[in-house]
Amino acid sequence: MLFDLFRAVAAARAAKALHPRGAVVAGTLVRHGTRPGTGVAWIDGTGVDEVLVRFSRGAGLPGPLPDVQGLALRSTSPGGAPVDVLLATTLGRRVPFPRRGTTGVLHSSIAAYRAPSGPLLLGARSHGPGFLLASAAPRGPWRPFAELHLRDDPARAQDAPLTFEPVLNAAPGLEFPSSWRRLREPAYAGSRAGRARGPAH
């Protein structure tokens, strides 16, 4: 059912079912790590990664209206594998919530990953012209592990045909719960199929 629903919406829009339009900018992720560690090298270790970041609005509503703000990040693991992280503005940590912008508001992974240290959320919050990335146990404090520096102003950037795969491209050591994968995978597959199909004539 999710596959068919997302395929129909994506075909009607000729775009992603959710977050149909966005702005893609390049950036640099400066990872300074965390202690105690989570068992995930991409979070615990230090490094500098070249990244792509896509900012988008969940329902695709016009700018003046509140919408769920999306922040999608493509980075690279210490072993060279792609790492995709999808974050959205939330009420608390787990409920998607519309906002007018990204300044001063939390973006969360919503679902907690499985990590060697236990369930782990990823989050981001604006920090100067960029963002601060952090991890947290579901009821624990946010612990910053990286700074995201953007090279361009997202308000002036164009979209790009990127497909983020947060389930397939999770950082080594992170894994989505099976219940979340069962929801995400047909939804993402349906959205891809709908975009390939395009609107009916």
Functional labels for PLM-detected ranges:
Residues 1-201:
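Active-site-adjacent core segments of small-molecule enzymes
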